[in-house]
Amino acid sequence: MASKVTDARDWYQKKIGAYDQQIWEKSVEQREIKGLRNKPKKTGHVKPDLIDVDLVRGSAFAKAKPESPWTSLTRKGIVRVVFFPFFYRWWLQVTSRVIFFWLLVLYLLQVAAVVLFCTAQSPHNIPLTEVIGPIWLMLLLGTVHCQIVSTRTPKPPPSTGVKRRRKLRKAAHLEVHREGDGSSTTDNTQEGTVQSYGTSTSYSIGAVFRDIWHAAFFLSGSKKAKNSIDKSTETDNGYVSLEGKKTGKSSEECAQAQERLCEVIKPEESGWSTTTMRETFGTPSHHKETHRTVTNLSDEVSSEEGPETGYSLRRNVERTSSDGTLRNRKSHHYKKHYPLEDTPKSGTSCSSRCSSSRQDSESTRPESETEDVWEDLLHCAECHSSCTSETDVESPQMNPCVKKEYRDDPFHQSHLPWIHSLNPGLEKISAIVWEGNDCKKADMSVLEISGMIMNRVNSYIPGIGYQIFGNIISLILGLMPFVFRLSQAKDLEQLAAHSATELCITAFGSNGDILVLSMVVISFVVRVSLVWIFFFLLCVAERTYKQRLLFAKLFGHLTSARRARKSEVPHFRLKKVQNIKMWLSLRSYLKRRGPQRSVDVIVSSAFLLTISVVFICCAQLLHMHEIFLDCHYNWELVIWCISLTLFLLRFVTLGSETSKKYSNTSILLTEQINLYLKMEKKPNKKEELTLVNNVLKLATKLLKELDSPFRLYGLTMNPLLYNITQVVILSAVSGVISDLLGFNLKLWKIKS
């Protein structure tokens, strides 16, 4: 229905637009329709030695983004929390098995608490907010988690292995046909599979819990899917590279599949000539046989694994098909200077060697995110430099699977142009490093300098003060109902005269009713657990902000000899244009390093929750400030407001300090002074130093133009919505202060 309305709207727009057209506009439209079809074209290359404004701004280092809007993600998060058992597969894939069972127990306990509250007949002093409060917090946490994992949306596996193989084979053939037609590849086939699976499956309550038990204890696909999701990388153009660590079973099956594939395509002789290779790639029978072998092996492997693992293994087998065919190439083919007639017509060996080198390094090194990233970047930078001339010419008869692998490789899509433009032999700067008391010079690239900074940040031992503070607040909020009932029932002097049994009866709000006691205990457990989870997320965000500040501090120490030696980082001066370029690249990369959007979601949720709590408190104070503290939930709101405000102040302090470190133009001004000092000592280099000085001045102006002040909320807020929120909240605070102090006070001012 929506598509028909859209088509009708477009048709009517064109219809009424035709009445306004003149002759010149029609001729222009005819030329626009022709486009570039009749234009002569020749091969061109992007200048690798130039920089874009995206590089300085940081948007060149793309981060993962969700495909759905935040309203859809909020709705999905609420639905997945309310119907938690029915979405057990999704929760198993985006969390671990232990966390899933913990959340399931909390969900069942909360349901039991609501049922007990509704069925309790005896009079009790338990307010409704004590039972309903954890539900709102559970919905908030579920929504936040759904927005965090929205960039990695796993798809449930089909019901049977035969249907899975059939649909995977169909999807593979459709992808090949789309590749041959030159059209863009989408996930329509997979989406259709998921939709048909979701609509054709109906569960009873007993079947749901039986499937939960079976999935948690007897299926390993969710664990593998989680590993592949956690290790995947995605950019703005929708690329997903699943490089998760495989279990022993999947690794053995993949190795066997690779051995069988290599036996099929292995030549009878030890070496092939270039002519033989060209004939082999040009033979249609060999092309079809190889593709059929890859498809069969991928179907065989994926029939026993989960969807994400099967996808990874299929990509692995496809890499092996290209690598096994090309690996007997002689070493002189990779030299930069060779005759054109000896040049192979395929550019996939670079991608194959890059992928295999990354897999080999992943199997031997420890599990570290930093090492994984830098190994990938270093291997692919070397691979790119060795295969630059080889990838200039592409074969029109390339294997579609290999061409898809080559096209989907993120290291060949210029997502990191400043890395790929670096030649390891040329794009280096002379930096000073300290080994004890010895000062030595070394030629270092951007990757090596940033790697040393990251190692220094990772070696930093974070404090646990805010974690302890979160634990204390969780316990206080959990015990608040008991303390409030004791304070309302008895005076402090009378409490000492009562026995422990009477105090417990008063604190639990019942005279021994087992249903009420169970409800209070369950609410206490659920409340403490959910509040602890929320403050745990805030502690994770606080640590991330602290790491960003450390990145900024160490980056500022690079151009200071004393601070660089103290911080054990390299030291170099901005005395050349190349040094300035690498300094700007390093600055942008470090600003984008680490969690970005996920942490912004947590901080934004805390910010919006604080605004809501402050607004409710102000409304309660304006409505009934005489009896404000006589309500249990008002005490909880005050505690929430104080604790969240402390965390937000911490975020504001760290974020503002980080922005100040990166926007510190005193470094560039100091380097300009050093250039003038160098001009005085070396008049013969005055022209060169003047050029560098002018570039420094331009860099200073550019940073001032692009840098923006720190924002507490990570989500983009409409200016109108921001002004409305500011007016409502600050007006409420102004009203409270004016009512309590007795004079008018305005704290807000609308800004355009």
Curated annotation (Swiss-Prot):
Glycans are attached at N296, N664, N723. Residues 327-337 have a biased composition (Basic residues). This is Protein PHTF2. PANTHER family: PROTEIN PHTF2, PUTATIVE HOMEODOMAIN TRANSCRIPTION FACTOR PHTF. It is found in: Membrane. It is a multi-pass membrane protein. Residues 6-153 form the PHTF domain. Keywords: Glycoprotein, Membrane, Transmembrane, Transmembrane helix. The chain crosses the membrane at residues 98-118, 126-146, 464-484, 520-540, 601-621, 635-655, 727-747. Residues 359-368 have a biased composition (Basic and acidic residues). Its main location: membrane. Residues 173-194, 227-251, 273-371 are annotated as: Disordered. Residues 182-194 have a biased composition (Polar residues). Residues 346-358 have a biased composition (Low complexity). One of its GO terms (cellular component) is endoplasmic reticulum.
